[in-house]
């Protein structure tokens, strides 16, 4: 009996020393986010946003009865930009924000959150950045994802297993891939690429009104006469499998002068011949001169020797996220 009493006393002492956190808000009143990634504006396909990544978001407030399209100039700042992260069962900010009766919220968001240090901003006009240069060391191969504007929201919404503000991210740059392989009818034993370059395009521009129907890349700057993508005197040996060079580019319409140039060596029966340089123009030869927002443009070359040494074609598709997380966050 004495042992049992001591046990009860110990338990009571433990409970008296234990701090019990009381949640003083209802889960449905918290502003949360329902996050997915869309491949591009041209498709409805979506993939889950990786829970290990974070993004930035801002919200603007209007009175009920006012719509964002008609009254956005009357909106007031509610919060942000703040970092949104996965909290175990939901997406939200460290500082909690709540839905208010008689008010609506409109949201702008971009990912990844690290872009905040590279000049991305949010205003009632949307997401923007000035003078984004894809050749700058700090920005090269970086991706910009912007969510569609979430207008006139009064509560969390359920979709794809989460509840919150619909936050659908899309790529806002353009992915340009160049694929090279040895032609089936090569006319040579081996093909070695010694140089590959592109030129006459812009690498710097301003992005405005991101997340809205009016978003665009403007003020194109820094025209590049030549960018060497690969150069090696020994050369890159081509095979039947494609060798792929991926590049992140400013969306733009190319000019008639925009080009791709390839130099290579062909080897036949131990005899080496220098081939090229061969210049192909994106508009004239590939018939593909538009690097649109959120697209993946692919230029394919099958290289050989002889009368018809290079077969080439181009294609443009939605920029589809890849990798185990379903989205490329660099």
Which residues make up each language-model segment?
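Positively charged n-region of N-terminal signal peptides that target proteins for export
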Residues: 1-4
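Sec-dependent N-terminal signal peptides
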Residues: 7-11
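C-terminal motif of bacterial Sec signal peptides marking the signal peptidase cleavage site
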Residues: 13-16
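Short, low-hydrophobicity acidic/polar segments
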Residues: 20-192, 228-244, 256, 261-268, ...
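Acidic/polar low-complexity flexible segments
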Residues: 146, 156, 186-231, 299
């Amino acid at each position: 009996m004495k042992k049992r009493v001591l046990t009860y006393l110990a338990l009571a002492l433990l409970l008296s020393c234990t701090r019990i956190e009381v949640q003083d808000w209802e889960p449905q009143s918290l502003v949360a986010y329902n996050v997915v990634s869309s491949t591009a504006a041209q498709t409805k396909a979506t993939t889950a946003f990786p829970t290990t990544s974070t993004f930035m978001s801002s919200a603007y407030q209007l009175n009920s009865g006012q719509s964002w399209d008609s009254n956005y100039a009357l909106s007031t700042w509610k919060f942000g930009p703040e970092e949104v992260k996965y909290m175990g069962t939901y997406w939200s900010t460290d500082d909690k924000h709540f839905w208010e009766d008689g008010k609506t919220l409109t949201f702008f968001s971009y990912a990844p959150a690290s872009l905040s240090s590279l000049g991305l901003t949010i205003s009632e006009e949307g997401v923007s950045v000035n003078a984004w240069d894809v050749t700058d060391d700090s920005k090269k191969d970086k991706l910009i994802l912007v969510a569609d504007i979430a207008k006139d929201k009064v509560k969390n919404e359920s979709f794809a297993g989460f509840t919150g503000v619909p936050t659908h991210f899309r790529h806002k740059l353009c992915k340009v891939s160049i694929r090279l392989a040895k032609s089936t009818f090569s006319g040579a034993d081996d093909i070695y690429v010694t140089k590959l370059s592109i030129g006459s395009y812009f690498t710097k521009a301003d992005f405005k009104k991101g997340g809205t129907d009016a978003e665009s890349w403007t003020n194109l700057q820094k025209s590049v006469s030549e960018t060497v993508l690969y150069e090696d005197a020994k050369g890159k040996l081509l095979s039947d499998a494609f060798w792929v060079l991926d590049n992140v580019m400013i969306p733009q319409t190319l000019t008639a002068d925009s080009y791709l140039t390839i130099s290579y060596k062909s080897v036949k029966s131990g005899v080496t011949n220098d081939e090229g340089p061969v210049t192909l123009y994106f508009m004239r030869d590939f018939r593909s001169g538009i690097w649109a927002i959120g697209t993946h443009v692919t230029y394919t070359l099958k290289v050989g020797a002889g009368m018809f040494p290079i077969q080439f074609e181009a294609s443009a598709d939605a920029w589809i996220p890849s990798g185990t997380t379903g989205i490329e966050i660099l």
